[in-house]
UniProtKB/Swiss-Prot annotation:
Major place of residence: membrane
Chain segments annotated as transmembrane: none
CDD domains to which the protein is assigned, alphabetical: F1-ATPase_delta
Family: Belongs to the ATPase epsilon chain family.
Pfam families noted in UniProt: ATP-synt_DE (PF00401), ATP-synt_DE_N (PF02823)
Subunit field text: F-type ATPases have 2 components, CF(1) - the catalytic core - and CF(0) - the membrane proton channel. CF(1) has five subunits: alpha(3), beta(3), gamma(1), delta(1), epsilon(1). CF(0) has three main subunits: a, b and c.
Protein name, UniProt field: ATP synthase epsilon chain
Subcellular location: Cell membrane
Keywords noted in UniProt: ATP synthesis, Cell membrane, CF(1), Hydrogen ion transport, Ion transport, Membrane, Transport
Length: 141
């Protein structure tokens, strides 16, 4: 039986990161993890800073690191992701992401009152999302 496809668009203020047909999506929303297939009920939800994955029409799993504020809009035939930043896993330099994670952890462990802890936590979450997306893709290859 053929898998039903639907359009996925991942858009940031700078570019269209992805625009093509997919057969499924897995995303981390504020309310929990979502699985989306063709003909899903309409939905709008806020995304967490986390890896986002989808299965292409060719059956390949692709991973994306979603960062910053992001929203997911689902209609029966199309899913649109609007987010501050998004990187496809092959665009992520794993070493740089690991260095960013270490820097964020060091800032969070410091007892300096000048540190913006919420910003450091966001940096840590962003680095972890990038690492997870990059590693997931490398494990699939």
């Amino acid at each position: 039986m053929a898998r039903k496809e639907f359009q996925l668009e991942i858009v940031t203020p700078e570019r269209i990161v992805y625009s093509d047909k997919v057969v499924s999506i897995t995303a981390q929303a504020e309310d929990g993890r979502l699985g989306i297939l063709h003909d899903h009920r309409p939905l709008v939800t806020k995304l967490q800073i986390a890896p986002f994955s989808f299965i292409t029409q060719e059956g390949q799993e692709e991973n994306v690191a979603i960062s910053g504020s992001g929203y997911l809009e689902v209609t029966p035939q199309k899913v649109t992701v609007l987010c501050q930043t998004a990187e496809l896993s092959h665009e992520i330099e794993l070493e740089r992401a690991q260095e960013a994670k270490e820097r964020a952890e060091e800032r969070l462990q410091a007892s300096d009152e000048a540190i913006d802890y919420s910003r450091a936590e966001a940096s840590l979450k962003r680095a972890i999302a990038r690492i997870d997306a990059a590693r997931a893709q490398r494990n699939d290859d």
